[in-house]
Amino acid sequence: MGREFLDLFEQWAESYDRSVEGYDEQYRDVFAGYDRILSTVADKAGQVVLEFGVGTGNLTKKLLERGKQVYGIEPSAPMRKKAAEKLSGRAVILDGDFLQFPTPPEPIDTIASTYAFHHLTDAEKDEALAKYSQLLHPGGKIVFADTAFRDKEAFRQAIEEARARGFHDLADDLEREYYTTLDVLASLFSKHGFSASFAQQNAFVWVMEAVKQTT
C-alpha cells in the first residue's frame, strides 16, 4: 500500500523541495510546471479536503491559502515534521496512507493528492477508490495529479528515453513503482461511480478530476 517505499520517502524528506524546484536534472521534466500543477489541484478542490501523501506540505499550503479546511495524511514521520514546520500548525497532519487512515471528523467534499497515487498497485488503487466512493457524497470529487501514461507503449518509451539520456535513477523509479495508464484509471474510477477527466500537465503528469455520480 505504498509503505514499502517509506525508507525512500524518509531519505527524500530533506531534499524533496529542491527536487521539485528543478535542481535534480533527472526529475526536472517530471516536476516541470510543479507550482502550476499544485495550483490547478487546489483550485479544483472543494472546501473540506482529505489530502493523501502530504509530503512536505506544498499542496496543503496552497489549499490553506484558498481558505480550505485540510485533513492531511502522510506515512513518513520526517515528511510530517517538515510539513508541520512549513504550515505552522494550520492543518491537521496525521499518520496514515491511501488505504489505512483516520476518518475525518466532518464530511469531506474532496480527496486530493499530488505525485503519490502511483505508490499503490492497480489492485490497491481499486481498493482505495472503493473506500473513497463511500466517503464522498454525490458531487464530491477526487482531484489527483500524478505521473501516468496514455498507454503501455508511451510508458515503455518513457523508460527507454530515460535510459538513453543516462537518467538511470528515473528509469529505475519508473520500473520500480506502480505507474499505470489512463485507460486503467478511467476504468477504476467508473467502477466506483466516478466520472473522470484527465488533463496532461507535462511529459509525465496528468491532473485527474473524478466526480462522484448520483447513486
From Swiss-Prot:
It comes from the Bacteria. SUPFAM superfamilies: S-adenosyl-L-methionine-dependent methyltransferases. GO terms for molecular function: S-adenosylmethionine-dependent methyltransferase activity. Its EC number is 2.1.1.-. S-adenosyl-L-methionine binds at G53, E74, D97. Pfam families: Methyltransf_25. Belongs to the methyltransferase superfamily. YrrT family. Keywords: Methyltransferase, S-adenosyl-L-methionine, Transferase. This is Uncharacterized methyltransferase GK2543. Could be a S-adenosyl-L-methionine-dependent methyltransferase. GO terms for biological process: methylation.
